[in-house]
From Swiss-Prot:
GO-annotated cellular components: bacterial nucleoid
Protein name per its UniProtKB record: DNA repair protein RecO
Keywords assigned: DNA damage, DNA recombination, DNA repair
Family of the protein in this entry: Belongs to the RecO family.
Top-level taxon in the UniProt lineage: Bacteria
InterPro entries recorded: ARFGAP/RecO (IPR037278), DNA_rep/recomb_RecO_N (IPR022572), NA-bd_OB-fold (IPR012340), RecO (IPR003717), RecO_C (IPR042242)
Function: Involved in DNA repair and RecF pathway recombination.
Pfam families in the cross-refs: RecO_C, RecO_N
Disulfide-linked positions: none
GO biological process, any: DNA recombination
Length: 264
């Protein structure tokens, strides 16, 4: 038996009493483990194996990197309460988990991303803005996804200071001197451009608070969604759920505002 550290990305029932647990492990990358009997009513495994929990367990990796690994006994587990209590925070954690799972190959060494996701979960549990934490992952995952926009400088002139916009044609930012070269640039405000550039390089350990306006947050999400929709073609179910949730929230806000207006 081996002690394995990991983050649970998702679980699903297997046969009557077992669970398949998708885990980002610290040393072995993405793996799927079988937890026998975890669905039985009195199983200690079943209550502990929750998505986004960070755990150490006794078990085994898949033999010859094929098939399933096994979870025999949990040694330690960290469950983030805010992710359980807040459906929006949980949804953004699920989005990050899905993106990591769909970006990398099975068994690929991902210690850096393991540490990054642990930090991300901690920041979410501390109450930092969940959209922004997810946006940072979305931006930084573009590199392993093979898109890697150039956020550093204008590729034509090398200019790194000044006014910029995002250009899909040039796969990154272009300076205002070259706006006429791309009629389909996204026409972003400069705060949005600033944060896009920062998010591409920022270390989550540096973030202790987030104060970004709703207008800028919408701009950031618009760019990120544009890249994922048009240049990658990747949209996890968690992303669709988040969009639906925000649509419901906006409908409720409008309903309340209209109701208050009529009551006057």
């Amino acid at each position: 038996m081996t002690v394995i550290n990991g983050i649970i990305l998702s679980t699903r029932q297997y046969k009557d009493n077992d669970l398949l647990v998708r885990i980002l492990t610290e040393t072995g990358g993405l793996r799927t483990f079988l937890a026998r009997g975890a669905k039985k009513p009195k199983s200690a495994l079943g209550s502990a194996l929750q998505p986004h929990a960070v755990l150490s367990f006794e078990g085994a990796f898949p033999k010859n990197n094929q098939g399933l690994g096994y979870i025999n006994d949990i040694q330690t587990i960290k469950i983030y309460q805010r992710l359980i209590d807040d459906i929006e925070v949980n949804a953004y954690a699920a989005l990050i988990a899905s993106l990591i799972d769909q970006t990398f190959e099975e068994g690929e060494q991902l210690t850096r991303w393991y540490n990054q996701f642990v930090l991300g979960l901690q920041k979410l549990d501390e109450g930092l803005d969940p959209q922004i934490i997810a946006n940072i992952f979305e931006i930084q995952l573009l590199v392993p996804l093979g898109v890697a926009p150039n956020w550093r400088q204008d590729p034509i002139s090398g200019q790194s200071v000044g006014q910029f916009d995002y250009s899909e044609k040039y796969n990154g930012i272009i300076s205002d001197k070259h706006y006429d070269l791309d009629d389909h640039r996204l026409m972003l405000d400069q705060k949005t451009v600033f944060y896009l550039r920062q998010f591409s390089i920022i270390d989550l350990r540096q973030i202790n608070q987030i104060n970004i306006s709703e207008t800028t947050k919408r701009g950031l999400q618009r760019v990120i969604d544009h890249i994922y929709d048009n240049q990658i073609g990747l949209k996890p179910k968690a992303k669709t759920f988040i969009e639906q949730m925000h649509a419901w929230q906006n409908t409720l806000i409008n309903f309340r505002q209209n109701g208050e207006g009529k009551s006057e």
